[in-house]
Amino acid sequence: MKKIKCALIGPGNIGTDLLAKLKRSSVLEPVWMVGIDPESEGLNRARELGIKTTAEGVDGLLPHVLADGVQIAFDATSAYVHAENARKLNALGVMMIDLTPAAIGPYCVPPVNLKEHLGKREMNVNMVTCGGQATIPMVAAVSRVQPVAYGEIVATVSSRSVGPGTRKNIDEFTRTTAGAVEKVGGARKGKAIIIINPAEPPLMMRDTIHCLTETEPDQQRIAESIHAMIEEVQKYVPGYRLVNGPVFDGKRVTVFMEVAGLGDYLPTYAGNLDIMTAAAARTAEMFAEEMIAGNLTLEPVVA
């Protein structure tokens, strides 16, 4: 079976977890891992898996893109450098899956809007944030039943699972997640809060989703919609679980979720890594299937 060759930029927690998932993919083949520190654990791990590596950043990858047939690149670095990375790789006809909160391209939350991206030939799609991937499906589950005036999400993650890149991007995280709660989740106004909990042993990712509906909530239809959406997310993140809810209080609908990871890189408490990397892999696989079927040809983008 033909596989689409991929590069990963950023060998941190997210990049390393994503590499494990891509190694299992039937349509994606990771061939390059890009970093900036030759001694980094992520680059060493990639080398051990037989992946080509460079410690010279994206510039170290560019000369090899065409020779090695790289067609999709995953950026798991930082919002600050994503624009430059995307510009350089798009110019060579490489599609970008953006796992930073840069959000240059349109937001993608697979169970909600993955199919919409298919015919649009986008060269850059943004995976929002781990908090966004865990909570926006629940906001969308309510908003597809009736209008949501306000959606607020609180993502609680273990300190150990949050690397230096994510810490530098906290403001971007909250802005990008709130924007996607509105654009993808369907809330008229969105707000996002992230809590990084230093408890030891590390706690599992927990997410609280509040929605204020414009009219009295249709409790039965909302509950059915939420359970159906949870099943959709579980197709690619089996550890996505309803802890409590939906709880109805006047026009407020609250859902409490927990996300366990597969333990590919960090232990299972780091569900925040899994929900992000599994969503990114799922998105890339859909585009790869279209490429293999001959329905999608990537074109260089001149910035």
Swiss-Prot record:
EC number: 1.2.1.10
Protein name in UniProt: Acetaldehyde dehydrogenase 1
Binding, NAD(+): 161-169, 272
Catalytic site positions: 130 (acyl-thioester intermediate)
Class of enzymatic activity (EC top level): oxidoreductase
UniProtKB keywords: Aromatic hydrocarbons catabolism, NAD, Oxidoreductase
Family membership: Belongs to the acetaldehyde dehydrogenase family.
Organism this protein belongs to: Cupriavidus metallidurans (strain ATCC 43123 / DSM 2839 / NBRC 102507 / CH34)
InterPro entries, sorted: Acetaldehyde_dehydrogenase, Acetylaldehyde_DH_C, NAD(P)-bd_dom_sf, Semialdehyde_DH_NAD-bd
Coiled coil: none
Pfam assignment, any one: AcetDehyd-dimer
Alphabetical list of SUPFAM superfamilies matching this protein: Glyceraldehyde-3-phosphate dehydrogenase-like, C-terminal domain (SSF55347), NAD(P)-binding Rossmann-fold domains (SSF51735)
Biological process, per Gene Ontology: catabolic process
One annotated GO molecular function: NAD binding
Catalytic activity reported: acetaldehyde + NAD(+) + CoA = acetyl-CoA + NADH + H(+)
Gene3D superfamilies: Dihydrodipicolinate Reductase, domain 2 (3.30.360.10), NAD(P)-binding Rossmann-like Domain (3.40.50.720)
